[in-house]
Amino acid sequence: MPNEMPSIYPLGVVGSGQIARMIHSAAVKLGITPRLMAEDSGDSAALAAPGASFRHPDALSTFAELCEVVTFEHERIDLGMIEHMEAAGQIIRPGARTLRAALDKIHQRRVLTAKGFTFAPFAELRGPDDLLDFAGLFGFPAVIKSVRSGGQSDRGSWVVDNQNDALRVMAEQADRELMIEQFQPIVKELVVVVARRAGGNARCYPVAETTYADGACLEIRAPAAIGTRVKTEAMETARAIAGELDSVGVIAVEFFLTTGGLVVNEIAARPHNAGHLTLENAPTSQFENHVRAILDLPLGPTHALAKAAVTVNVIGGLDGVDPAEHLHEALAVEGASVHLYGKRPRPGRKLGHVTALGDDMEQARELARRAEAALMNRRL
């Protein structure tokens, strides 16, 4: 029967937010039927595809038995279970080695600094003595971070200007494992998205530049306004990190460009917000190349199609505006591509994004910002 669902799916995606939704769409484009493991029937991807509960302890391993390959859209996973599943012969992409580095920032830094990659000076933060020791060496301001990644929407970091600020954060976040690192004099925040197959074949997308406020990514621009030397260093470093961690699929490496040079900030072992503009600005989006990589299919080209591309995130405000109610106005902005995730609005929640291409960055930025403002019923 034409509508009969397969007994074994070629691809399983754990999570049902917007990244899973876009992975699902990329797979369907290639004629691949993915299976989603949903947290909630009202989640973004769950609205567009069948899913399964993942609230029971055995649900993940049961789900994986229905799929040839399993991938993840978020970091809220049990690493021990992943290792057990791999030992049982199930194919997880990326694998436990990559996921451990993405999930645990201390482990990530120890593994990669041992191989010569540059991070800010850091230390575990188990109590006041660790704080005093670190402050004695590096002073303030400093940055306190949650050791375990909470996913793309988790704030997870706090800039502290003095010892009292640091002790307050430690008390407020007492239920988390914490680390502290030296504050960096940031000139720009950069991201390189890399797609890598199991055999080591990898392709990088152009370096993107991001703008953050209050822990939320507001805007992404590509190509980043940096020199050739920095661009080459960032892409080579990201490719090398993907290889060192034996990553399969898409991995994103975030950098700080500081007054002293390029410093690795974080890695994300999944498609990244900074790569959303590849839906319009690359022959093969990060989502399609993620599907290709984890299924060991040839990677597609990753070069930019336009001289400038800008993505502006659509983030819920205190006024409760629903961007879906203003879609008509946003679509009237010619040259802007609107992506809404089907989420109910709430303050700080990412509800969608808008991407615009242009011959120069300001032209693309103006189009994207106009469409985002229209969605949020706001005048520029």
Task: Give a label for each model feature.
Residues 232-253, 258-259, 268-319:
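Active-site "cap" helix and flanking loop/linker of ATP-utilizing ligase/carboxylase catalytic domains
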